Amino acid sequence: MSKLKGLLLTEGMHGMISQVEGLAKALGIDYIHQKVEINLLAKLLPPKITPISNLFFKKFTVPEIDLVISCGRKSVIPSLYLKKNSTKKIVNIHIQDPKVSLSNFDYVIVPEHDGLNGKNIISSKGALHYLTLKEIEKNHEYLSDKIDKNKQQILLILGGPNKYYKYDKKNMSRIFENIKGLAEKNNLQIIIIPSMRTPADTIDYANKFFGSENLVIQNVDKKAYLSGLSIAKFLVVTCDSTSMISEAALTGKPIYVAQIPSKRDDHRFRQFRDLFSKLNLSLIHI
């Protein structure tokens, strides 16, 4: 029997790609990934009042598919359009709260801390992701020639600014000082890994702040990320990324959450971290 064929729709961010590909791999389907690009008007309109039309996103070639897995606000309208206009019955699955009627999708997968309920809702404890321990260990040696073999490593994984958290120099300086203090106290080498959302000036600042005795990865590098997860004894993830905290939890290592003062009520992020703590996943706030 041939495998089902799926189309994955995201905005191209690491966390979203990780979630749709993680689900696709778990379902055992063949899939291709399509980055969604919406026009200016669609960026201004919330999905619930945006017409289901291909006038609101950049057209792309649609292969023969059995299901669509989408994640993020920008992928909602393309997913609904494909389901509505398909010549065959396709299943559409959306990850995260789509902010439209849930009945538009066959299934909606959301983290438990979002508090959404419905007959087609599937709740997850954290964010879905595509990582496996086998893949992490496979990339162990990628950074091995760049680290100090006489020290253990602590990994700092940087997310990026959003409407809740600001990545200004004041906030980054406090995080960097805390990490540097931990490293010096315990004779650790620091590895810093950025993500797609990490501002360039934050990476530049990290490079200057931590110096040559530590390792700052300058660009988004999946192999470096996986290698760092494998090599490091301690993991630190900025509080803005539920996806990367969920991925780090796979390792079973102690996870430190680098706190950033919130600009607005961040109760969903706090509920997520509280849930992980209740699951004994060793979240330590710094």
List PLM regions with ranges:
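A donor-sugar binding/catalytic signature common to diverse glycosyltransferases
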Residues: 11-13, 225-268
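N-terminal pre-catalytic "stem/leader" segment of glycosyltransferase-like enzymes
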Residues: 1-56
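Glycosyltransferases and closely related glycan-assembly transferases
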Residues: 20, 28, 77-91
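Alpha-helical membrane-targeting segments
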Residues: 37-64, 81-85, 268-274
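Catalytic donor nucleotide-activated moiety binding site of glycosyltransferases and closely related
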Residues: 187-222
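A nucleotide-sugar donor-handling region in carbohydrate enzymes
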Residues: 102-168
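Conserved small/polar residues in nucleotide/adenosyl-binding loops
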Residues: 284-286
